[in-house]
């Protein structure tokens, strides 16, 4: 199995420096990861550095709270794609979901999907803040809104991916969407558990450790 092609090699810490971005770019090229997942401020630079490689640039929208307006998320998405992003991971309006304002949640996702103009959209539902019923509803709304993936976590809300959540999400969306597991996937054992549960993409800062069969102490 080519583990690397399942991995979005991730660096989303607010204090990320250019040197650290250079490091994950070089690691992504060396191991041929599916993408690097970075904050929007680094997208243009990373896209230039990765030109000619198979590694995609993935960035985050409305991150990490999901509480910015739909209009803001739309602008962020268009800007990121114009600067070279091929994939965007957006955070849903979590409060609206908990309020039962499902139409607002769906329209928020649809706004980003439309702005992405055919690029891959992954919808972060922040599982650690949701009940199982809410996880199912968020996954259903992502499907109806036309997203490509539903994703477990930002890694910033105190909890990450679990095999149980991944399975619940996959059972909900079926073959229509893929599932990305992120947050706390630190080693090859974690990685395999997520794939067995139905994930087809893994977001992790421990990408190198995973493909080398080592352990990482990273939370994301």
Curated annotation (Swiss-Prot):
Tell whether Cytoplasm is among the UniProt keywords.
yes
Q: Where is the active site?
A: 89 (proton donor/acceptor), 151 (schiff-base intermediate with acetaldehyde), 180 (proton donor/acceptor)
The protein's Enzyme Commission number: 4.1.2.4
Catalytic activity reported: 2-deoxy-D-ribose 5-phosphate = D-glyceraldehyde 3-phosphate + acetaldehyde
Instruction: Output a single Gene Ontology CC term carried by this record.
Output: cytoplasm
**Entry annotated with the keyword Transcription regulation:** no
Identify the InterPro entries for this entry: Aldolase_TIM (IPR013785), DeoC (IPR011343), DeoC/FbaB/LacD_aldolase (IPR002915), DeoC_typeI (IPR028581)
Report the top EC class in one word. lyase
Main subcellular location of this protein, as a coarse class:
cytoplasm
Named from the GO MF annotations, one term is: deoxyribose-phosphate aldolase activity
A biological process (GO) of this protein is: deoxyribonucleotide catabolic process
Sorted keywords for this record are: Cytoplasm, Lyase, Schiff base
Q: Name one Pfam family in it.
A: DeoC
Q: Sorted alphabetically, which Gene3D superfamilies does this protein's record hold? A: Aldolase class I
The record's CDD domains line, in alphabetical order, gives:
DeoC (cd00959)
The listed locations are:
Cytoplasm
Instruction: Write out the pathway annotation from the protein's UniProt entry.
Output: Carbohydrate degradation; 2-deoxy-D-ribose 1-phosphate degradation; D-glyceraldehyde 3-phosphate and acetaldehyde from 2-deoxy-alpha-D-ribose 1-phosphate: step 2/2
Explain the purpose of this protein. Answer: Catalyzes a reversible aldol reaction between acetaldehyde and D-glyceraldehyde 3-phosphate to generate 2-deoxy-D-ribose 5-phosphate.
Q: Which PANTHER family match?
A: DEOXYRIBOSE-PHOSPHATE ALDOLASE
What family does the database annotate? Belongs to the DeoC/FbaB aldolase family. DeoC type 1 subfamily.
Name of the protein in its database record: Deoxyribose-phosphate aldolase
């Amino acid at each position: 199995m080519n583990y690397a092609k399942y991995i979005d090699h991730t660096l989303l810490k607010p204090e990320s420096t250019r040197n650290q971005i250079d490091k994950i770019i070089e690691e992504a090229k060396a191991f041929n990861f599916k993408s690097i997942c970075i904050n929007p401020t680094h997208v243009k630079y990373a896209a230039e550095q990765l030109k000619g490689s198979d590694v995609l640039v993935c960035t985050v929208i409305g991150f990490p709270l999901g509480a910015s307006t739909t209009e803001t998320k739309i602008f962020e998405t268009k800007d990121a794609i114009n600067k070279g992003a091929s994939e965007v991971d957006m955070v849903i309006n979590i409060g609206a979901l908990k309020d039962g304002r499902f139409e607002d949640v769906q329209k928020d996702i649809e706004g980003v999907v439309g702005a992405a103009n055919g690029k891959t959209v992954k919808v972060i539902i922040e599982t650690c803040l949701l009940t199982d019923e809410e996880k199912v509803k968020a996954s259903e709304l992502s499907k109806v809104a036309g997203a490509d993936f539903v994703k477990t976590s930002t890694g910033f809300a105190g909890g990450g991916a679990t095999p149980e959540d991944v399975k619940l999400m996959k059972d909900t969306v079926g073959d229509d969407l893929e599932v990305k597991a992120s947050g706390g996937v630190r080693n090859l054992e974690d990685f395999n558990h997520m794939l067995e549960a139905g994930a087809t993409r893994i977001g992790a800062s421990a990408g190198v450790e995973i493909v080398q069969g080592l352990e990482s102490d990273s939370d994301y």
